């Protein structure tokens, strides 16, 4: 069993799952699978490790780097514990699929469990921290496409289809990344067409801080959404991963605005693009 303590507070982005999957990948030589990793969910500012914040699409790729550094120390420690058993230096041994063997004589081998359970069982505890490499970036590449219909009599815009493409390097958690892509389109759709805080012109007090007057898109407003993940560019992370969060909605408003322009022939750059703005642009009000 591996206890992984990297107390970043999960906000729904899937970074915890990325950490577990990345840890299992790094410890694959020990025969570790995700099911054998116990995630430490306890976050206490008195005792917990200091970790990176949930921002800038950086958690998964930054933590994958430090996990890889810690894993190298685990490998070294395991091989050093095997030295008195195999009577050879640690550099003369290797670990594959949970078995330790002598390179010159692969038949001379034992499982990692057999080696670690001899004598007193002393857990291997590794604590590592690592500063982000300022020379590398975790920023992804992305693109959006939108198909819309515009009623030129009422000014109503219907978004029929959205395609979001993210090249975020190696995808560590595919279903989580796709969920972020879809969520980004929902937020981008609202930002472009309906969401707006209205202030009292005299007092500056917000007038629509509620879920009735602040118009968030509902399921009934959702178009067909196609999330596409590419793995062409290799980012800053240990596995060639990089962030995805902010990049899921950055281009959505402009894609919808461009589609509206192609539909009515008039450019509107002021969002949200409500029906009255369409009619005003067409000279109908």
Predicted regions and their residues:
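Adenylate-forming
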Residues: 10-13
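Short, aliphatic-rich beta-strand segments
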Residues: 1-6, 159-161
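Thiamine diphosphate
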Residues: 15-23
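C-terminal catalytic domains of large/alpha subunits in multi-subunit enzymes
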Residues: 22-285
């Amino acid at each position: 069993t591996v206890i992984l303590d990297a107390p970043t507070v999960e906000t729904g982005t899937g970074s915890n799952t990325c950490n577990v999957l990345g840890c299992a990948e790094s410890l694959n030589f020990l025969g570790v699978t995700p099911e054998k990793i116990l995630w430490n969910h306890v976050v206490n500012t008195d005792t917990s490790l200091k970790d990176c914040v949930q921002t800038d699409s950086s958690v998964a790729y930054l933590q994958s780097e430090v996990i890889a550094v810690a894993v190298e120390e685990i490998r070294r420690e395991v091989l050093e514990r095997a030295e008195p058993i195999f009577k050879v230096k640690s550099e003369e041994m290797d670990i594959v699929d949970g078995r330790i063997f002598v390179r010159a004589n692969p038949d001379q081998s034992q499982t990692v469990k057999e080696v670690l359970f001899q004598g007193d069982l002393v857990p291997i505890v590794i604590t590592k921290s690592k500063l982000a490499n300022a020379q590398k970036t975790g920023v992804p590449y992305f693109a959006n496409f939108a198909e819309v219909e515009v009623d030129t009599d009422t000014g109503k815009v219907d978004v029929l289809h959205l395609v979001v493409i993210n090249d975020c390097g190696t995808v560590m958690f595919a279903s989580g990344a796709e969920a972020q892509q879809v969520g980004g389109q929902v937020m981008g759709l609202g930002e472009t067409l309906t969401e707006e805080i209205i202030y009292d012109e005299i007092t500056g007090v917000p007038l629509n801080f509620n879920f009735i007057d602040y118009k968030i898109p509902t399921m009934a407003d959702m178009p067909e959404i196609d999330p596409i993940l590419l793995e062409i560019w290799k980012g800053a992370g240990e596995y060639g991963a990089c962030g995805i969060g902010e990049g899921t909605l950055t281009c959505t408003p402009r894609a919808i605005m461009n589609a509206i322009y192609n539909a009515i022939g008039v450019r509107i750059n002021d969002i949200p693009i409500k029906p009255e703005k369409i009619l005003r642009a067409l000279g109908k009000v």
